[in-house]
Amino acid sequence: MSNIEERVKKIIVEQLGVDEAEVKNESSFVEDLGADSLDTVELVMALEEEFDTEIPDEEAEKITTVQAAIDYVTSNAQ
């Protein structure tokens, strides 16, 4: 597991209050991890802060799974 992947999963566990074992790369934030729209906004904000990046709204809407978050950060982290 890459450092970015570990950090993303740690943020998801903290933000959504889920067990680390539930956080799989293919997990959907809403369907699998029980997030609501506010949770997803807060999750994006936490990712922006952790990785010192800005995620535009149109990109944030596409980040619906753990893997999508990892991929976005990997491609765009500074």
Swiss-Prot record:
Cellular component (GO) terms are: cytosol; membrane
Pathway involvement? Lipid metabolism; fatty acid biosynthesis
In the UniProt record, does the keyword Protein biosynthesis occur?
no
Q: Which UniProt keywords apply?
A: Cytoplasm, Fatty acid biosynthesis, Fatty acid metabolism, Lipid biosynthesis, Lipid metabolism, Phosphopantetheine, Phosphoprotein
| Residues bearing PTM O-(pantetheine 4'-phosphoryl)serine | S37
Entry's SUPFAM superfamilies? ACP-like
Where it sits in the cell: the answer is: Cytoplasm
Which GO terms label this protein's molecular function in UniProt?
A: acyl binding; acyl carrier activity
- Domain named Carrier: residues: 2-77
Could you tell me the Gene Ontology terms of the biological process aspect for this record?
lipid A biosynthetic process
| Post-translational modification note | 4'-phosphopantetheine is transferred from CoA to a specific serine of apo-ACP by AcpS. This modification is essential for activity because fatty acids are bound in thioester linkage to the sulfhydryl of the prosthetic group.
Q: Its domain of life?
A: Bacteria
| Pfam families, per database record | PP-binding
Task: Report the sequence similarity comment from the record.
Answer: Belongs to the acyl carrier protein (ACP) family.
Q: What does this protein do?
A: Carrier of the growing fatty acid chain in fatty acid biosynthesis.
Protein name per Swiss-Prot or TrEMBL: Acyl carrier protein
